[in-house]
């Protein structure tokens, strides 16, 4: 985000109840009333952003549609801040105006955060909130605190302290896709980025070793780590891994195309099938990965 100078992560929570709520006629009114409990405001903001995309098959129009909705949300947050600062007679520094919860008709629940942990906490909270809202209206009304009281809670220093606002790690908010990540240089690279707070998407063909190393990394580091078993010479598998990457983290910042091997043999003895296999892994796979990453960079405008 150019406005906040912060790298943001996006998390999509696959949940039929959330999808049904986001697509319902009641969502426009019910979702804008407030939080289930006052302290949720520091994790979810006071209201979610609602999206009902009209241009799903046109990426440029969809980008403009989402950008317009975000600008409207941020403007409303600025007004919320100014109104409550004036009415409460307090001197506060405005927090970032981005939503934490996005409800997308036909899709469901998307969350935004500075770390994987933040996005997952926000998703957990709002999944429960949806249930509370529905049950409340089934038996009566849902009447949370008004905006002025939520403002007091959101800007209360003791509540903000819960977020643990320490200096961000060097690579916090960065999403790094690494191939050949189960051993050697790939694993060492993963550890280095994890030490610096990056979110990792680790890829390897060796399922057992990859799972084992991911478990070790998750115990050692607090950052978000996802993995996918992929044959990088298979274009369809690479494309599926990028789809999973987007669902998990929302995008990509860095690609480390590391997977490869060195086939040895005398020039007159190495058969053509072995050479072709070597080129598939050591040349064409890197082109496939780079192509997928560049397409995503272009969509992200990064």
Q: What kind of region is each of these model predictions?
A:
Residues 174-201:
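Canonical Rossmann dinucleotide-binding motif of NAD(H)/NADP(H)-dependent dehydrogenases/reductases
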Residues 290-291:
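A short, exposed helix-loop element centered on a Lys and neighboring polar residues
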Residues 1-170:
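Domain-length cofactor-binding catalytic modules of enzymes
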Residues 221-224, 244-255, 263:
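A glycine-rich helix->loop->beta "capping" turn
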Residues 207-208, 229-240, 272:
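The beta1-alpha1 cofactor-binding region of Rossmann-like NAD(H)/NADP(H)-dependent oxidoreductases
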């Amino acid at each position: 985000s150019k406005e906040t100078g912060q790298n943001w992560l996006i998390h999509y929570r696959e949940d039929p109840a959330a999808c049904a709520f986001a697509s319902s006629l009641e969502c426009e009114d019910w979702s804008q009333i407030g939080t289930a409990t006052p302290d949720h405001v520091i994790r979810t903001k006071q209201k979610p952003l609602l999206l009902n995309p009209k241009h799903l098959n046109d990426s440029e129009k969809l980008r403009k549609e989402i950008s317009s909705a975000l600008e409207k949300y941020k403007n409303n947050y600025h007004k919320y801040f100014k109104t409550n600062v004036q009415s409460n007679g307090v001197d506060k520094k405005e927090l970032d105006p981005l939503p934490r919860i996005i409800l997308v008709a036909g899709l469901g629940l998307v969350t935004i955060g500075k770390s994987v942990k933040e996005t997952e906490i926000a998703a957990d909270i709002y999944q429960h909130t949806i249930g509370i809202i529905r049950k409340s209206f089934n038996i009566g009304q849902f009447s949370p605190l008004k905006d002025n009281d939520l403002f007091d809670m959101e800007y209360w220093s003791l509540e903000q302290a819960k977020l643990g606002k320490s200096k961000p790690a060097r690579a916090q908010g960065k999403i790094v896709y690494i191939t050949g990540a189960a051993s050697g240089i790939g694993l060492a690279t993963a550890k280095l980025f994890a030490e610096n707070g990056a979110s990792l998407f680790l890829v390897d063909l060796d399922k057992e070793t990859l799972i084992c190393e991911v478990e070790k990394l998750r115990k050692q580091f607090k950052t978000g780590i996802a993995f996918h078993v992929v044959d990088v010479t298979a274009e369809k598998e690479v494309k599926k891994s990028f789809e999973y990457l987007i669902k998990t983290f929302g995008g990509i910042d860095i690609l480390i195309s590391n997977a490869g091997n060195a086939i040895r043999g005398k020039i007159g003895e190495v058969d053509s099938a072995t050479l072709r296999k070597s080129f598939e892994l050591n040349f064409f796979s890197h082109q496939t990965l780079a192509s997928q990453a560049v397409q995503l960079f272009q969509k992200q405008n990064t």
